[in-house]
Amino acid sequence: EIGSGLVGSEMCIRDSVETDKFLLTSKLILTPFTSFILVSVIRKCIDAKRPYEKYNIKPLFIKETKGESMPSRHVFSITIIAMCWLYVSVPVGIIMLMLVAIMAASRVLAGVHFVRDVVVGFAVGIICGIAGLWII
């Protein structure tokens, strides 16, 4: 029968993939992906002004973006990547989380984010990482 060949192929493929590796790979791809979409939607909804918009200052980075300042997507992104590393290698994850501070400071000092933007970006990255990697 036609259908039985497809079922047999599916079983063969499923048996050849280690469930633990498949689950790990799925988590490491889907957690950042879905979290990034969530953060992008939150930014559009909040639409917070950036420091250079609010105080009419010139940012150190060439930036013409208006609004969408909170949460910081750069800080969120490096945080969620650090959480993925923490999930597979604690020492590397800890180093990556320390690097988040440098990224956060650079975004604030450059005048493209407020402190609250980077703190919220970090917090959302931690929460999404815990939820997507350890809880779900």
PLM region descriptions:
Residues N56-I136:
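Membrane-embedded catalytic cores of phosphoryl/pyrophosphoryl-handling enzymes
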Residues P32-R50:
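Transmembrane alpha-helix/helix-exit interface in multi-pass inner-membrane proteins
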